[in-house]
Amino acid sequence: MKKIALKNAARGTAFDYAGQSWILLENDDGRALCLSKDIIETRAFDEGNCNNFAVASSKEYLNGAYLDNLLEDVNGPNAFLTTELDLTTDDGLKDYGTCTVTIFLLTVDQYRRNRDVIPNADDWWWLSTAFSTKSNGYESLARLVNTDGTLNGNYACSGYYGLRP
């Protein structure tokens, strides 16, 4: 694949970076929101069955070992920028607030906004949005995307679904 300048690229453009294939979803003020073209691995949203991405084991993995491996393939730590991720739940509750991350799973809102340029995956994959919160009786259900692109949800401890940062 040839080199491209993301600031000039169209939404939906596929490109290779840091040893992976990515899809450009959004460009805004010199920042690009990208999604891995493929699921990187199958893993629980959270091994402790908590649907709050701010404390989820998947967030720790993506911003730990996974990010470290990506950084080995690029020039320096500024290759990936931090983001303030809005963790508003699917039913609109704001109990989980926001979290600052570098690598993350899309929110339901980001997914919906960019669905037209996101290709379906071969398996189901997690989003960072919770179904609802502990205060509303739902501390374990997290949202995910089916193979046909429709939204679903399941228990955060389920290890059958993919991570697609």
Language-model segments: what does each one mean?
Residues 1-164:
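Collagenous Gly-X-Y triple-helix signature in extracellular proteins
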